């Protein structure tokens, strides 16, 4: 396999047509569909999500290290949380514990920080994820009997996959976080699923919905901690006319959790304090709303009108999910400000069409400003440099919520063309 460090392929909105033709896009859609179907009618197990992250500061003293799976946790307790022991899932949990510990060791700088705290850059500089990822039990496809070939494939996999993981924590340069970073984590999980790294080692069964929820719960608690501790800006937010300042996928996962759940709350009542308090630690949709209530005050219909609109016009969680996926296809998969930061490698997310031909790259002049993080595998450190594409963007309106056309289906719908302005 010809592994390669991911590189920039999308330089302006015209490149989105080529992205739609790419194997990379097909793989991302496949991962999205696989994940949202796997979490149907599953709850996040108790003790995984951190209640303090979705609780107003007046009720707590600080933002402590999330209680995920402690090092002293017994095997029995672990199996109660994630089912039969899956060593590679536990390694991911260890990774998030390590990243949370780095936050504890990197307090925010004192003084006013309107546009993000510079200590977040120190946090990014400290990250060294490769030693933890190398603990994975790799499948036969990567760890062949040929030692040199095995090392080459494992290093190659880590080279490409770690790029997406490192890019999922927000921008070190801009000090922001948004749906593009959330997409990078989806891509990272997709790479683990594709090479069966998350399969159960003893039974070879595929990862189940509960384990997917646990992994994403660890991720969302980490990045929301980064947002809170370092005051990260929303990346490319529409303000009140966007679904959420930072997230989108989390709502799709949460809506999917409620599908086929006979005890799921009624959609129209899901903004009530009773539902939020009872479901915020077991369901991503409600958990995300609880996080909004932590960040914002005032009438909900004024600061979050799109979500408010959902709960006045939609009557089933299947239709909620359908509408959210349609919005995702347009607002994430078809927006240049988001996808310009999604880079393509050679194996995991290649910039090739379905016949294996390289797609054209309309390269533009770059300046050293905003290049996503890169990982060096021949050392135990990660190196970060920066570049940014200078391109003009047009003023194109935000996509309206598609609640009026919500035919029930499990398939990921095809998108229509639309773009939005990047954050200034």
From Swiss-Prot:
Catalytic activity: [protein]-peptidylproline (omega=180) = [protein]-peptidylproline (omega=0)
GO biological process, one term: autophagy
Record localization: Cytoplasm; Nucleus
Keywords of the record: Cytoplasm, Isomerase, Nucleus, Rotamase
Start-end of Low complexity biased regions: 375-394, 413-424
CDD domains: PTPA
A single MF term (Gene Ontology): protein tyrosine phosphatase activator activity
UniProt function note: PPIases accelerate the folding of proteins. It catalyzes the cis-trans isomerization of proline imidic peptide bonds in oligopeptides. Acts as a regulatory subunit for PP2A-like phosphatases modulating their activity or substrate specificity, probably by inducing a conformational change in the catalytic subunit, a direct target of the PPIase. Can reactivate inactive phosphatase PP2A-phosphatase methylesterase complexes (PP2Ai) in presence of ATP and Mg(2+) by dissociating the inactive form from the complex.
Name under which the protein is recorded: Serine/threonine-protein phosphatase 2A activator 1
